[in-house]
């Protein structure tokens, strides 16, 4: 029994080291740095065409932004920043969505981009919304993808005691996150990605792989913890964003069974933003499982409608 336990421990340690080495390789040399009023900001570029900024969601970074926008890079030049507290980006004392929006304007100055479409997923929708409000002359189109926001004075995401304990256990610990993601990936997809894991059995291989990739790319979780906690605060706090002031053409996308309740949020936003278009699929969860191609198609058609 002792020898078996030692062997199992050695295997686990080796598997963990291999995963972290692969993660470091995946992140290395893919991103760039720019100076902003809030400090350094990490970003990556993919594709060619009209510029579109893809602002990642909770637990992300530039790598998640690239994944969210990978189909769009066939049509657009995707700019994928790491928001405050994620990977190599700064975490200033003011890490509000408004401050993040202003820092993104500085990033665009560095890239010599005057105007572009802006998409924000999950908690990234807060920053996208603030960008549209604060920099209306620079935002040609706005896409709010599974928007995580408190529009009613009631946090739409409520974890039970066991869920909260699990989340707290993995935040900041790469080992704990890796172990739980390896041993109970479906439970992690439900808890962290707010998606019914039963959907994995009803979608094609590419979509199952995408779900697994989103989960795997939360590593290193320790380099995203500040951003995760910041997102939890701002997405649960009553939104101060003047959504009614948004003038850019707006597309809002969600799934009815999103366990973070973004379908209800999407409907409220569609009522507040003049002329907003709304699409809600019956199922797909918070990572719109089974609808990645649909999301890309909706965004491309929406953005292209106003361009010759």
Question: Which residue stretches match the model-derived regions?
Answer:
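Flexible "cap/lid" loop of the alpha/beta hydrolase fold
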Residues: 142-174
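Conserved HGGG/HGGXW glycine-rich cap/lid loop of the alpha/beta-hydrolase fold
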Residues: 42-88
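Conserved acidic catalytic loop of the alpha/beta-hydrolase fold
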Residues: 99-116
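Short beta-strand/loop motif that positions the catalytic acidic residue
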Residues: 246, 252-254
């Amino acid at each position: 029994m002792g020898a078996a336990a030692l062997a199992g421990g050695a295997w686990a340690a080796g598997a963990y080291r291999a995963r972290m080495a692969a993660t470091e390789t995946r992140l290395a040399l893919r991103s760039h740095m720019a100076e902003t009023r809030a400090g350094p900001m990490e970003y990556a570029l993919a594709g060619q065409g009209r510029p579109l900024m893809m602002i990642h969601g909770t637990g992300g970074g530039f790598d998640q932004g690239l994944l969210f926008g990978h189909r769009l890079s066939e049509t657009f030049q995707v700019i994928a920043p790491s928001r405050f507290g994620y990977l190599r980006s700064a975490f200033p004392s003011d890490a509000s969505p408004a401050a993040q929006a202003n820092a993104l304007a500085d990033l665009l100055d560095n890239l010599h981009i005057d105007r572009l479409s802006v998409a924000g997923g999950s908690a990234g929708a807060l920053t996208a919304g603030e960008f549209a409000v604060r920099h209306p002359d620079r935002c040609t189109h706005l896409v709010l993808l599974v928007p995580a926001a408190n529009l009613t004075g009631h946090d739409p995401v409520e974890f039970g005691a066991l869920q909260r304990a699990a989340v707290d256990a993995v935040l900041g610990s790469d080992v704990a996150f890796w172990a739980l993601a390896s041993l109970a990936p479906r439970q992690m997809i439900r808890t962290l990605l707010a998606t019914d894991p039963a959907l994995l059995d009803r979608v094609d291989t590419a979509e199952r792989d995408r779900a697994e990739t989103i989960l795997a790319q939360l590593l290193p979780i320790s380099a995203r913890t500040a951003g995760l906690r910041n997102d939890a605060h701002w997405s649960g706090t009553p939104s101060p964003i003047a959504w009614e002031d948004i003038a850019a053409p707006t597309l809002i996308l969600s799934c009815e069974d999103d366990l973070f309740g973004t379908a209800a949020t999407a409907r409220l936003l569609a009522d507040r933003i003049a002329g907003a278009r709304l699409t809600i699929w019956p199922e797909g969860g918070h990572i719109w499982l089974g609808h990645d191609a649909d999301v890309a198609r909706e965004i491309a058609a929406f953005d292209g409608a106003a361009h010759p």
